[in-house]
Amino acid sequence: MPQIFGIWSLLNLLAAIYIYTVLPEFTLRFLAVFLSRIAYRVRVVGEENIPKSGGCILTCNHVSFVDWIIISATIKRPIRYVLYYKFTQIGALKRFFKDAKVIPIAGKSEDRKVLINAMKTIEQTLRDGEIVCIFPEGNITRTGELGEYKRGIETMLKTISVPVVPMTLHGLWGSFFSRKHNGKALSQPSVLLKNWFGTVELRVGEYLKAEDVTAEKLEILAREQLD
């Protein structure tokens, strides 16, 4: 019996690896759903505001290192995330970010080539009818407060007109994956157990037409959702 169980486990592992190589997006979303469900009680308000088809941009406050997991587990459509390019260059994570089709981005003064490529990729992704998610603050909060929304969203909308859906995450500040603890995440293992299976909520607002979008307006809407 132990031998049969071992063989069955090995076959399942091989099947999982094969599915990942063929359908990495499906596998990653499955993992996102699995991880979020065992760690949190996740609920979503306003899911009907996500367009059923066509390109759109999601914006969200940046509370922790697992924001993308919660969003991916909650929104049924595939999502491509825009991420600071230096994170995508971390050796052990390069393959993961590539398979997840993460779009690396840099500031104008850092790497103009990366920035230009990011804008082109974002535009093409939206034209292909896919969803792009950005965190307009540009950083994970260190205070729990909402930071200033950068104007990158306005640059994106200069070349293509798509709906923009404002969202906010609630319940992750103070978690093991946030920077509440001396500005460092993943540094207080005891917090992981303390907050285990806490409630996390994703609030999805009504989408805005591209011509009505400014970084300032999105920030105001986010603050209203957070109140």
PLM region descriptions:
Residues 71, 96, 124, 155-159:
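Hydrophobic/aromatic ligand-binding patch that stacks against planar heteroaromatic rings
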Residues 12-21:
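Alpha-helical transmembrane segments
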Residues 144-213:
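A cross-family acyltransferase "interaction/gating" segment
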Residues 38, 52-111, 174-178:
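Catalytic core of membrane glycerolipid acyltransferases/transacylases, capturing the structured
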Residues 2-10:
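Hydrophobic alpha-helical transmembrane segments
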Residues 123-154:
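Catalytic-site beta-strand/loop segments enriched in glycine and acidic/polar residues
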Residues 55-57, 129-135, 165:
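Residue-level preference for the first positions of well-ordered beta-strands
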Residues 24-62, 127:
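Helix-to-loop junction immediately C-terminal to a conserved catalytic motif
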